[in-house]
Amino acid sequence: MGEERVFVSTLSKLFRINHGNKFEVIGYKSLGLLAGLYSVVQKEQRIMHDKRSEESSLEQSYQTLQPMDPDTARTVLVEVKKILDQLGVIFFLRQGTCLGAIRDKGFIPWDDDLDLGSVIGLHGFTEEQVDPVIVAFKELGYYTKLERCKEYLYIAMMKSNIRIDWTCYRIVDDNIIHFPGVPIPVHLITRLKEIEFAGETFLVPNPPEDYLAAKYGPNWMIPKSSGYEKDILAMITDLPIQQRQSAIGENSDSSTTRVRILDQHGEPVKNALVKVVRHGIFRTNEQGYALFRLPEENWYSLVINHSSHEEVLYQERLARGITYVYRPDPSTTSGRWLALSQE
């Protein structure tokens, strides 16, 4: 029978030779190569944990729409600017971030994200630059998520519980299309204007007042924490009335999207109107289903109408071939995002 011995290997691992003359690891010392390897493993575990945490924070940010901490938002915005500047990417403040910078001279108190934009084909920016930029942000600790759509590339990033929405627009008929379908004349972006904001120099559309009126309507100077969605939808040209009333019918295929409308008692609503902004208005059948076809999986705005009830669902993620359910919230008729659930 073998003699039991204990020794330390050159890798600082503690071994024991048992009675069967087999090596058995019984511990290690935090020295040398093993300590370094253990440190690397710990670092990778922390990175994976942080990535899962930031991914969860991103999804949660869409659900809760919690206002940003202004000091943290300022720090993240300045860091993002530094990164994009070093990569040679021209970007501008857009939507709520631009609105706050121009109207409020700071972040809007209830704003929940940082809105940045670039235009493919302007200022030397190309679509091929997007992926390397995403890699750079990942290496610097940002969680990133890329979505490619017909009219833009949408890059959501998360760091320090701050969501950054960087949208890279394609030019469509001399416009760039802001969600949920607002056409912004590209000439407002061609020669960007410098402003002082958050202790740094940033670019905004030029003139910013015209841009904000195009996005938010003529009353953009009036602060609104809710209800602004209707002002934005009013800026979008709807489909002609004869197309708006078109329907697929009861027979549908795997590409048909359905939204079932329920009332406050959970009962299906017949003849409710479901407006999918830019894509038509559809009437529900006896089972409460509205049926329509979408061009792609994307974010969409919907307006639900029946009897005296109306609610704007400003930002919903819809895919082809999926059935969703709408349930009203008696406490509100505006401001909900991701209110639909899958059936």
What are these model-predicted stretches?
Residues Y62-L87, V133-P180, E196-F202, S226, ...:
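Conserved catalytic core of two-metal-ion nucleotidyltransferases
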Residues I304-H306:
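Conserved structural position at the C-terminal beta-strand
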Residues G124-E127, L291-L302:
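Short Pro-Gly-centered beta-turn/loop motif in secreted/extracellular proteins
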Residues S9-R94:
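Helical scaffold of the NTase/Pol beta-like nucleotidyltransferase catalytic core
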Residues K81-L114, I120:
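Active-site nucleotide-donor binding segment shared across nucleotidyl transfer reactions
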Residues H178-E194, G280:
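Short acidic, Pro/Gly- and aromatic-enriched capping/linker segments at domain boundaries
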Residues T256-T257, H265-R278:
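Short, ordered, surface-exposed loop/turn motifs in non-cytosolic proteins
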